[in-house]
Amino acid sequence: MQPPSFSTSEDTVQPVSAASPIASDDASSAFVVAVPARYASTRLPGKPLQLIGDRPMIQHVADRALAAGAREVWVATDDARIAEAIQGLAGVRVAMTSSVHLSGTDRLAECARIAGWDAATCVVNLQGDEPFAPAAGIRAVAQVLQRSGAEMATLAAPVDSAHDLFDPNVVKLVRNAHGDALYFSRAPIPWHRDSFAGQRDAVPAGNHWLRHIGIYAYRAGFLQQFAAMPPGTLERIESLEQLRVLEAGYRIAVALTPEQFPPGIDTPEDLQRAQAQLASA
Protein backbone atom coordinates (compact mmCIF):
# COMPACT_ATOMS: atom_id res chain seq x y z
CA MET A 1 0.00 0.00 0.00
CA GLN A 2 1.11 3.57 -0.70
CA PRO A 3 1.22 5.98 2.25
CA PRO A 4 -1.14 8.96 2.15
CA SER A 5 -0.12 12.47 1.14
CA PHE A 6 0.17 14.86 4.08
CA SER A 7 -0.43 18.56 3.40
CA THR A 8 -0.60 21.65 5.56
CA SER A 9 -1.97 25.11 5.02
CA GLU A 10 0.56 27.93 5.09
CA ASP A 11 -24.18 24.99 -18.02
CA THR A 12 -27.91 24.87 -16.77
CA VAL A 13 -29.10 21.56 -15.36
CA GLN A 14 -32.53 20.09 -14.85
CA PRO A 15 -34.05 20.44 -11.37
CA VAL A 16 -34.11 17.43 -9.10
CA SER A 17 -37.55 15.92 -8.63
CA ALA A 18 -38.99 16.69 -5.23
CA ALA A 19 -40.84 13.40 -5.19
CA SER A 20 -38.28 10.80 -6.08
CA PRO A 21 -34.92 9.70 -4.72
CA ILE A 22 -31.82 9.86 -6.86
CA ALA A 23 -31.21 6.51 -8.56
CA SER A 24 -28.09 4.91 -7.19
CA ASP A 25 -26.87 3.72 -10.59
CA ASP A 26 -27.11 7.06 -12.42
CA ALA A 27 -23.91 8.29 -14.01
CA SER A 28 -22.38 11.31 -12.27
CA SER A 29 -19.52 13.69 -12.80
CA ALA A 30 -16.38 13.53 -10.74
CA PHE A 31 -16.53 14.53 -7.09
CA VAL A 32 -14.18 14.60 -4.14
CA VAL A 33 -14.90 13.62 -0.55
CA ALA A 34 -13.58 15.46 2.49
CA VAL A 35 -13.98 14.00 5.98
CA PRO A 36 -13.62 16.43 8.91
CA ALA A 37 -12.19 14.59 11.92
CA ARG A 38 -11.23 15.92 15.33
CA TYR A 39 -10.03 14.04 18.36
CA ALA A 40 -11.96 15.96 21.00
CA SER A 41 -15.52 14.74 21.40
CA THR A 42 -17.59 15.45 24.50
CA ARG A 43 -19.59 12.22 24.49
CA LEU A 44 -17.00 9.91 22.92
CA PRO A 45 -13.41 11.14 23.31
CA GLY A 46 -11.04 10.09 20.54
CA LYS A 47 -14.02 9.08 18.42
CA PRO A 48 -12.22 8.78 15.04
CA LEU A 49 -9.74 6.32 16.58
CA GLN A 50 -12.27 4.10 18.35
CA LEU A 51 -12.01 0.57 17.03
CA ILE A 52 -14.79 -1.06 15.05
CA GLY A 53 -13.57 -4.58 14.53
CA ASP A 54 -9.81 -4.28 14.38
CA ARG A 55 -9.69 -0.93 12.59
CA PRO A 56 -10.24 2.67 13.73
CA MET A 57 -13.51 4.33 12.78
CA ILE A 58 -11.86 6.89 10.50
CA GLN A 59 -10.53 4.10 8.28
CA HIS A 60 -14.03 2.68 7.85
CA VAL A 61 -15.33 6.13 6.87
CA ALA A 62 -12.53 6.58 4.33
CA ASP A 63 -13.35 3.15 2.91
CA ARG A 64 -16.94 4.25 2.27
CA ALA A 65 -15.76 7.33 0.40
CA LEU A 66 -13.43 5.23 -1.74
CA ALA A 67 -16.23 2.73 -2.43
CA ALA A 68 -18.42 5.59 -3.68
CA GLY A 69 -15.92 6.30 -6.44
CA ALA A 70 -14.65 9.68 -5.27
CA ARG A 71 -11.90 11.16 -7.43
CA GLU A 72 -10.04 12.16 -4.26
CA VAL A 73 -10.58 11.37 -0.57
CA TRP A 74 -9.16 13.67 2.10
CA VAL A 75 -9.31 13.53 5.88
CA ALA A 76 -9.14 17.02 7.39
CA THR A 77 -7.80 16.98 10.95
CA ASP A 78 -5.65 18.91 13.40
CA ASP A 79 -4.52 15.82 15.29
CA ALA A 80 -1.40 13.84 14.41
CA ARG A 81 -2.88 10.66 15.91
CA ILE A 82 -5.74 10.75 13.41
CA ALA A 83 -3.33 11.49 10.56
CA GLU A 84 -1.20 8.52 11.59
CA ALA A 85 -4.27 6.26 11.58
CA ILE A 86 -4.68 6.96 7.87
CA GLN A 87 -1.12 6.00 7.02
CA GLY A 88 -1.01 3.03 4.68
CA LEU A 89 -4.59 3.51 3.49
CA ALA A 90 -4.18 3.74 -0.27
CA GLY A 91 -6.02 6.55 -2.02
CA VAL A 92 -6.54 8.71 1.07
CA ARG A 93 -4.77 11.99 1.77
CA VAL A 94 -4.57 14.03 4.96
CA ALA A 95 -4.90 17.79 5.32
CA MET A 96 -3.43 19.03 8.61
CA THR A 97 -5.68 21.95 9.49
CA SER A 98 -5.83 24.61 12.17
CA SER A 99 -6.79 23.63 15.71
CA VAL A 100 -8.98 26.73 16.19
CA HIS A 101 -11.79 25.95 13.74
CA LEU A 102 -15.25 26.28 15.28
CA SER A 103 -16.99 23.94 12.83
CA GLY A 104 -16.44 21.15 10.37
CA THR A 105 -17.30 23.56 7.55
CA ASP A 106 -14.39 25.81 8.51
CA ARG A 107 -12.09 22.79 8.57
CA LEU A 108 -13.29 21.63 5.15
CA ALA A 109 -12.82 25.09 3.66
CA GLU A 110 -9.18 24.98 4.76
CA CYS A 111 -8.86 21.44 3.38
CA ALA A 112 -10.15 22.67 0.00
CA ARG A 113 -7.49 25.37 -0.06
CA ILE A 114 -4.77 22.87 0.86
CA ALA A 115 -5.99 20.45 -1.83
CA GLY A 116 -6.04 23.22 -4.42
CA TRP A 117 -9.49 22.38 -5.77
CA ASP A 118 -10.85 24.84 -8.29
CA ALA A 119 -14.09 26.69 -7.57
CA ALA A 120 -16.24 24.30 -9.62
CA THR A 121 -15.08 21.11 -7.85
CA CYS A 122 -17.96 19.15 -6.29
CA VAL A 123 -17.03 18.52 -2.66
CA VAL A 124 -18.93 15.97 -0.55
CA ASN A 125 -18.73 16.53 3.19
CA LEU A 126 -18.88 13.06 4.79
CA GLN A 127 -18.99 13.10 8.57
CA GLY A 128 -16.22 11.24 10.38
CA ASP A 129 -18.69 9.25 12.50
CA GLU A 130 -20.44 7.51 9.56
CA PRO A 131 -18.53 4.22 9.22
CA PHE A 132 -21.43 2.51 7.43
CA ALA A 133 -22.48 5.34 5.09
CA PRO A 134 -23.79 3.72 1.89
CA ALA A 135 -21.74 4.39 -1.22
CA ALA A 136 -24.97 5.01 -3.16
CA GLY A 137 -25.90 7.80 -0.76
CA ILE A 138 -22.50 9.48 -1.09
CA ARG A 139 -22.81 9.42 -4.88
CA ALA A 140 -26.40 10.61 -4.70
CA VAL A 141 -25.66 13.84 -2.83
CA ALA A 142 -23.04 14.74 -5.45
CA GLN A 143 -25.58 14.05 -8.20
CA VAL A 144 -28.17 16.26 -6.49
CA LEU A 145 -25.76 19.18 -6.48
CA GLN A 146 -24.67 18.65 -10.06
CA ARG A 147 -28.23 18.42 -11.43
CA SER A 148 -30.02 21.03 -9.36
CA GLY A 149 -27.89 24.11 -9.91
CA ALA A 150 -28.23 24.85 -6.18
CA GLU A 151 -25.35 26.16 -4.13
CA MET A 152 -25.57 23.21 -1.75
CA ALA A 153 -27.20 19.78 -1.57
CA THR A 154 -28.12 17.25 1.08
CA LEU A 155 -30.27 14.15 1.62
CA ALA A 156 -33.34 13.23 3.65
CA ALA A 157 -35.35 10.16 4.60
CA PRO A 158 -38.96 9.72 5.74
CA VAL A 159 -39.59 9.98 9.47
CA ASP A 160 -40.88 6.56 10.50
CA SER A 161 -41.59 6.97 14.21
CA ALA A 162 -43.25 9.47 16.52
CA HIS A 163 -40.18 9.27 18.74
CA ASP A 164 -37.99 10.63 15.95
CA LEU A 165 -40.59 13.20 14.93
CA PHE A 166 -40.60 14.80 18.38
CA ASP A 167 -36.94 14.17 19.24
CA PRO A 168 -34.99 17.48 19.03
CA ASN A 169 -31.82 15.53 18.25
CA VAL A 170 -33.41 14.32 15.00
CA VAL A 171 -33.41 17.26 12.60
CA LYS A 172 -36.48 17.60 10.40
CA LEU A 173 -36.88 19.56 7.16
CA VAL A 174 -39.50 20.75 4.71
CA ARG A 175 -39.04 21.23 0.96
CA ASN A 176 -40.70 23.27 -1.75
CA ALA A 177 -42.21 21.79 -4.92
CA HIS A 178 -38.82 21.85 -6.65
CA GLY A 179 -37.06 19.85 -3.95
CA ASP A 180 -35.26 22.76 -2.31
CA ALA A 181 -35.15 23.08 1.47
CA LEU A 182 -37.51 25.64 2.96
CA TYR A 183 -36.36 25.10 6.54
CA PHE A 184 -34.54 22.73 8.90
CA SER A 185 -35.66 22.41 12.51
CA ARG A 186 -35.36 20.37 15.65
CA ALA A 187 -39.11 20.82 16.00
CA PRO A 188 -41.65 18.53 14.27
CA ILE A 189 -42.24 20.37 11.00
CA PRO A 190 -44.68 20.71 9.40
CA TRP A 191 -46.86 20.98 12.51
CA HIS A 192 -50.05 19.01 11.85
CA ARG A 193 -52.54 21.13 13.75
CA ASP A 194 -55.42 18.66 13.68
CA SER A 195 -53.51 15.40 14.22
CA PHE A 196 -51.22 16.69 16.95
CA ALA A 197 -54.12 18.24 18.82
CA GLY A 198 -55.50 14.76 19.47
CA GLN A 199 -52.47 12.46 19.71
CA ARG A 200 -48.72 12.53 19.27
CA ASP A 201 -47.83 8.85 19.41
CA ALA A 202 -47.80 8.20 15.65
CA VAL A 203 -46.59 9.89 12.49
CA PRO A 204 -49.63 11.30 10.65
CA ALA A 205 -50.41 9.89 7.21
CA GLY A 206 -49.19 11.73 4.16
CA ASN A 207 -45.42 11.24 3.92
CA HIS A 208 -44.85 14.92 4.69
CA TRP A 209 -42.26 14.38 7.43
CA LEU A 210 -38.60 14.09 6.54
CA ARG A 211 -35.53 13.75 8.71
CA HIS A 212 -32.28 15.28 7.61
CA ILE A 213 -29.25 13.11 6.83
CA GLY A 214 -26.09 15.02 7.67
CA ILE A 215 -24.19 14.66 4.41
CA TYR A 216 -23.60 17.68 2.17
CA ALA A 217 -22.23 18.61 -1.22
CA TYR A 218 -21.16 22.02 -2.48
CA ARG A 219 -18.86 23.54 -5.05
CA ALA A 220 -15.46 24.37 -3.61
CA GLY A 221 -16.01 28.05 -4.37
CA PHE A 222 -19.28 28.17 -2.42
CA LEU A 223 -17.68 26.25 0.44
CA GLN A 224 -15.31 29.21 0.90
CA GLN A 225 -18.27 31.62 0.86
CA PHE A 226 -20.18 29.51 3.37
CA ALA A 227 -17.27 29.39 5.80
CA ALA A 228 -16.82 33.17 5.52
CA MET A 229 -20.49 33.98 6.26
CA PRO A 230 -21.28 35.17 9.79
CA PRO A 231 -23.62 32.87 11.74
CA GLY A 232 -27.27 33.75 11.24
CA THR A 233 -29.98 34.30 13.82
CA LEU A 234 -31.86 31.11 12.90
CA GLU A 235 -28.63 29.12 13.01
CA ARG A 236 -27.97 30.35 16.55
CA ILE A 237 -31.51 29.58 17.71
CA GLU A 238 -31.66 26.04 16.30
CA SER A 239 -27.91 25.33 16.49
CA LEU A 240 -28.04 24.12 12.86
CA GLU A 241 -25.25 25.44 10.66
CA GLN A 242 -27.06 24.79 7.38
CA LEU A 243 -29.64 27.46 8.27
CA ARG A 244 -26.91 30.04 7.64
CA VAL A 245 -27.17 29.19 3.94
CA LEU A 246 -30.96 29.54 3.77
CA GLU A 247 -31.01 32.72 5.83
CA ALA A 248 -28.47 34.26 3.44
CA GLY A 249 -30.79 33.51 0.50
CA TYR A 250 -29.02 30.55 -1.09
CA ARG A 251 -30.56 27.25 -2.21
CA ILE A 252 -30.09 23.83 -0.65
CA ALA A 253 -31.36 21.03 -2.90
CA VAL A 254 -32.70 17.98 -1.05
CA ALA A 255 -33.37 14.49 -2.42
CA LEU A 256 -34.46 11.30 -0.72
CA THR A 257 -31.58 8.95 -0.04
CA PRO A 258 -31.49 5.92 -2.35
CA GLU A 259 -30.29 3.74 0.52
CA GLN A 260 -30.76 3.93 4.28
CA PHE A 261 -28.01 5.62 6.28
CA PRO A 262 -27.38 3.83 9.59
CA PRO A 263 -27.20 6.19 12.58
CA GLY A 264 -23.90 7.95 13.17
CA ILE A 265 -21.77 7.19 16.21
CA ASP A 266 -21.92 9.75 19.02
CA THR A 267 -21.91 7.76 22.26
CA PRO A 268 -20.30 4.63 23.74
CA GLU A 269 -23.64 2.86 23.24
CA ASP A 270 -23.61 3.79 19.54
CA LEU A 271 -20.09 2.39 19.29
CA GLN A 272 -21.16 -0.90 20.86
CA ARG A 273 -23.99 -1.20 18.33
CA ALA A 274 -21.58 -0.51 15.47
CA GLN A 275 -19.18 -3.14 16.73
CA ALA A 276 -22.02 -5.65 16.98
CA GLN A 277 -23.24 -4.74 13.48
CA LEU A 278 -19.81 -5.38 11.99
CA ALA A 279 -19.42 -8.64 13.90
CA SER A 280 -22.75 -9.92 12.58
CA ALA A 281 -22.09 -8.89 8.97
Swiss-Prot record:
<keyword id="KW-0548">Nucleotidyltransferase</keyword>
<comment type="pathway">
    <text>Nucleotide-sugar biosynthesis; CMP-3-deoxy-D-manno-octulosonate biosynthesis; CMP-3-deoxy-D-manno-octulosonate from 3-deoxy-D-manno-octulosonate and CTP: step 1/1.</text>
</comment>
<comment type="similarity">
    <text>Belongs to the KdsB family.</text>
</comment>
<dbReference type="GO" id="GO:0033468">
    <property type="term" value="P:CMP-keto-3-deoxy-D-manno-octulosonic acid biosynthetic process"/>
</dbReference>
<dbReference type="InterPro" id="IPR029044">
    <property type="entry name" value="Nucleotide-diphossugar_trans"/>
</dbReference>
<dbReference type="GO" id="GO:0005829">
    <property type="term" value="C:cytosol"/>
</dbReference>
<keyword id="KW-0963">Cytoplasm</keyword>
<dbReference type="Pfam" id="PF02348">
    <property type="entry name" value="CTP_transf_3"/>
</dbReference>
<keyword id="KW-0448">Lipopolysaccharide biosynthesis</keyword>
<protein>
    <recommendedName>
        <fullName>3-deoxy-manno-octulosonate cytidylyltransferase</fullName>
        <ecNumber>2.7.7.38</ecNumber>
    </recommendedName>
</protein>
<dbReference type="GO" id="GO:0008690">
    <property type="term" value="F:3-deoxy-manno-octulosonate cytidylyltransferase activity"/>
</dbReference>
<keyword id="KW-0808">Transferase</keyword>
<dbReference type="InterPro" id="IPR003329">
    <property type="entry name" value="Cytidylyl_trans"/>
</dbReference>
<comment type="pathway">
    <text>Bacterial outer membrane biogenesis; lipopolysaccharide biosynthesis.</text>
</comment>
<comment type="function">
    <text>Activates KDO (a required 8-carbon sugar) for incorporation into bacterial lipopolysaccharide in Gram-negative bacteria.</text>
</comment>
<dbReference type="GO" id="GO:0009103">
    <property type="term" value="P:lipopolysaccharide biosynthetic process"/>
</dbReference>
<dbReference type="InterPro" id="IPR004528">
    <property type="entry name" value="KdsB"/>
</dbReference>
